[in-house]
């Protein structure tokens, strides 16, 4: 029995090196290896192609075992003997790839690289060298990437400069506001100081001189009577200064409202005047047009009369339609008729 089973590994090794096995596998790999690459990602198409490869190998092995008469048990024992020898592992590798996906993937990637190298060799033989797209492709891409990086850096630099300018302008604006607010806060609020500087409150301008004198004397008496309560006096002095701008603002608002009313009235009057002038102009224009129309009609009438007169003068006198026939002509006509009748009679007799 042992001698009978010794020929099985040799026959299997011979089949795996025969064209019946190598040609179908080579055609399958060459037609489907272009999808496989060196990336670590396992795509769905890889598994589908692996299933198709497994079905092909099983069909070829089944046909071989049926032709030779080998059982599956004998085939598995021969496969275990192949694993011990390193030289036969490369021959038996396509069979093991049916159960090992990574081995199948490595075989397909290797086949794809071999086909690419063969294609480059053929192109080099035909053209005498490789084209620039195949030799300088990496360098061109790197140059494009460098240009893009330079453009991005320039854009970032300009955007940063614009941002700094905007922030600087905002800082200057805030400093100007702070300076204006500080200058406003430093201005004196005391009415006596404002009067000494030549600036007067709107209330003080509206008050008469007698009231001003009375208010000044009253304040002096109060100051003399209540010297210890200086703080209250200061507060009472500060009150008019606070109220004055409010009243002034009210007066300003009233004056602005009055100005607006006056402007509206002026506009209304202007529009009324414009409408009146437009109506007058329309009336004058219509009258002028009527006058011109009357003149044209009169001229047409005069020219029509002149034409009729000239036509009547130039026309010849009509000749009488029927002139009276003289006696001599009547006699001649009768003679002609008589001659014509005689001629007719002679012709008829003949």
Swiss-Prot record:
Signal peptide: none annotated. GO terms for cellular component: axoneme; ciliary base; motile cilium; nucleus. Residues 171-233, 301-337 are annotated as: Disordered. The keyword Cytoplasm applies. Keywords: Cell projection, Cilium, Coiled coil, Cytoplasm, Flagellum, Nucleus. It holds the Pfam family ARL2_Bind_BART. Residues 142-167, 280-350 form a coiled coil. It is found in: Nucleus; Cytoplasm; Cell projection, Cilium, Flagellum. This is Cilia- and flagella-associated protein 36. Belongs to the CFAP36 family. Residues 177-220 have a biased composition (Polar residues).
